[in-house]
Amino acid sequence: MLTIFIVTATLFAILYFYFTRNFNYWKDRNVVGPEPTVFFGNIMESVIRRKHLIMIYKDIYEAFPKEKVVGIYRMTTPCLLLRDLDVIKHVMIKDFDLFNDRGVEFSEEGLGLNIFHADGDRWRVLRQCFTPLFTSGKLKNMLNLMSDRGDKFIKMVEKFCDKEPEQQIIPLVRKFTMASITTCAFGMELDEEMIETLDKLDSLIFTTSYGNEIDMMYPGILKKLNSSIFSKMIAPFFDNLTKTIIEQRGGKPTNRKDLMDLILELRQKKAIEPMKKTHDEQVTTLELTDSVIAAQTFIFYAAGYETSASTMSFLLFELAENPDIQEKVIAEVDETLKRHNGEITYDTLSEMTYLTQVFHETLRKYPVADILLRNAKADYAVPGTNVTLKKGQTVVVSGFGIHYDPKYYPDPEKFDPERFSPENVRNRHPCAYIPFGAGQRKCLGMRFGQWQVQVCIIKLLSKFRFEPSTKTMSEFNYDPKRLLVYPKSGIFLNIIPRNY
């Protein structure tokens, strides 16, 4: 009995030491931060899926208002949360060559070689290749596709609202984003079978994976094990879909001018060239194989589907809660569409300046894809501090923390589109608003995402007004099991046909 006790006690002591071995790292360097919990570090509530990781980082940000940086532990791994905007600007922009890798490494197989997750030279080659596909000139051709899907969506909404004015908004607008993304990316018309398949993929793509926590504890292990954070069911779907579409088009672009057309046109021109060396990186080239194309179409779908649907839902919620703002947007929509004969074009969107301000204020309050991570590629003296990051360590930036900081946004809980008037934007620090990231790794598809949201909102407000319902919540708790910001209770609103 005594022997069992001694062995058990020894085992617990060893495990305790192992899982706390790094927890004096920041204290030894005089960097303040919250006390870590054994095994979990500072993210226990996220690991047990009690609280969204985004809100944990926001709480840490707010707990240390006088600090430029805060020492934290993602599981047992020391990381640095950045609070000071000038420090963030250095890391994300000025010293980007030392921080061009994201915080999670995993296998390039199974869609891992997408532009969002790719690191090093592979990311540089992909960025050089795909950036020209997301210019205003290229995306203008997709506006007609979005608008057409918007018209069909409105007819469906009319039928729903005839039966029941109160609607759960997120699943409703997802029907638009799913149709818009699939037609703009793949040129597909959705049938019931495809809709059912994509609905199943939604939970697989956007449900948090414990692979993230494993990589936090043992950085780089997923890559060493040739493993991914994505479900094994996702890659075959996008691989097969991409292969089928390419075969249907004979491997050549058509006249649709959707994303697949632009990629096939790029492949025909062989537009990928080697990059110059940066620091100790090796120059690489990258062939646009079907697998590489599948990885890009996957991330385009994943990034544009859920984020746009959530942003639209939060935007409509704020319009319902602020009817004076809603009426101002409706007036702008009506007047602008009248000038353009009801057509939604690039000029139409450009002239709806107040709607654009509402869009940005929505993402200020609800940055749906919030956390920014970067890995140091070499030892780095953090500007304005006595802190030195070691090569391979990760920095964390909390968009929620910054967006709710009264130093940058007085009365941050208030929904105020005037924060994004041209004058206010000019006077604000460039890193005080980061819903799409910052620097060269800023979201390539941000213009597409903004247009997709605006097109749908224009279509909806042309026909309806939105009001709170009996189920409308005034505050949101975010689902810790979802990868992005998603309200657990949903968003319910009454959709009321406009009386002209």
From Swiss-Prot:
Domain of life, per UniProt, equals Eukaryota
Matching Gene3D superfamilies: Cytochrome P450
- Keywords (A to Z) from UniProt: Endoplasmic reticulum, Heme, Iron, Membrane, Metal-binding, Microsome, Monooxygenase, Oxidoreductase
Which cofactors is this protein said to need? heme
Enumerate the GO terms in the molecular function aspect: heme binding; iron ion binding; oxidoreductase activity, acting on paired donors, with incorporation or reduction of molecular oxygen, reduced flavin or flavoprotein as one donor, and incorporation of one atom of oxygen
The entry's heme-binding residues are 443
Compartments where found: Endoplasmic reticulum membrane; Microsome membrane
**Catalysed conversion reaction:** an organic molecule + reduced [NADPH--hemoprotein reductase] + O2 = an alcohol + oxidized [NADPH--hemoprotein reductase] + H2O + H(+)
Q: How does it sit in the membrane?
A: Peripheral membrane protein
**A single Pfam family, by name?**
p450
Q: What is one term from the GO cellular component aspect held by the record?
A: endoplasmic reticulum membrane
Q: What induces it?
A: By furnocoumarin.
As recorded in UniProt, its EC number(s) are: 1.14.14.1
This molecule's function is given as: Enables the insect to feed on furanocoumarin-producing plants and evolved as an adaptation for detoxification of xanthotoxin and other furanocoumarins. This isozyme metabolizes isopimpinellin, imperatorin, and bergapten at high rates, xanthotoxin and psoralen at intermediate rates and angelicin, sphondin, and trioxsalen only at very low rates.
The family note in this entry says: Belongs to the cytochrome P450 family.
Q: What is this protein called?
A: Cytochrome P450 6B4
What species was this sequence derived from?
A: Papilio glaucus
Tell me the organism's taxonomic lineage. Answer: Eukaryota, Metazoa, Ecdysozoa, Arthropoda, Hexapoda
